[in-house]
Amino acid sequence: MHHFTLFSLRRLSYALMYFRRPPWDTGISPPELMEHIAGHSAGRALDLGCGTGTNALTLARHGWQVTGVDFIPAAIQQARRKAGAAGLPVDFRLDDVTRLDGISGPFDLALDMGCFHSLDRTGRPAYLNNLERLLAPGGTFLLYAFLQAGNEAGKRGLTEAEIMAIANRLDLVNRVNSTERGRIPSAWLTWRKAAA
C-alpha cells in the first residue's frame, strides 16, 4: 500500500506540472541526441518518459520509427497533437515504463532523459528488465540522469552502485558528467547491449 501511495503522489505531482510547461520541456532536443542521430543510421527508437514528444519527434524527422511512452495522459495528448501537426507517424503510448507489456522490440535506440532517475528504487529493476528485453543486440541506451552521492531512499538520481549494476547488463561506452542548472550533479551515459 505504501508503494501505491508514493507512486500515486508522484504521478499526481508530474500530472500537475503539465497544466503549465514543465521545466524539463524545453522544446529543443539536446546535442547528445543530435550527435547520436548524426552518427547512426535510422532504425527503431523507444523514448522512455517521452513527455510531450520533443525528442521522439526529432528522431522521427530524421527517419527513425519511434515509440514514445509516458504515464501522464496530458503529456501523451500533447505529444500526439504535436505529431499530428507535424505529420510525423510517432506511436505515443500511455504506459508505465516499469510494465511495457504491449510494446515489442527490438529497438536500436532507447532514450531516457530523466525518467529512470525519477523512479523509486522498487521500480528500477522492472525498468531495466524491460530495457534489456526491448533493446536490440548492439542497440544503444542513451541516458541522462541526475546523480547522487549517497543512497538516500526517495531521492532522485542514480548512485555509482546503480550505474555499476547497469554495467552488469549493458556495456558503458561513454560517460560525461556535468551539472544541471549549475548545481545538480548529472551525467549523460551511453550504454550498448552486447551483439548477439
Map each language-model feature to its residues.
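Class I (Rossmann-like) S-adenosyl-L-methionine-dependent methyltransferase catalytic domain
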Residues: 1-46, 52-105, 119-134, 139-196
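Residue-level marker of regulatory loop/turn positions in helix-turn-helix DNA-binding domains and
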Residues: 108
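A conserved beta-strand element that flanks and buttresses the S-adenosyl-L-methionine
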Residues: 111
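Short catalytic micro-motifs in class I SAM-dependent methyltransferases
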Residues: 114-118
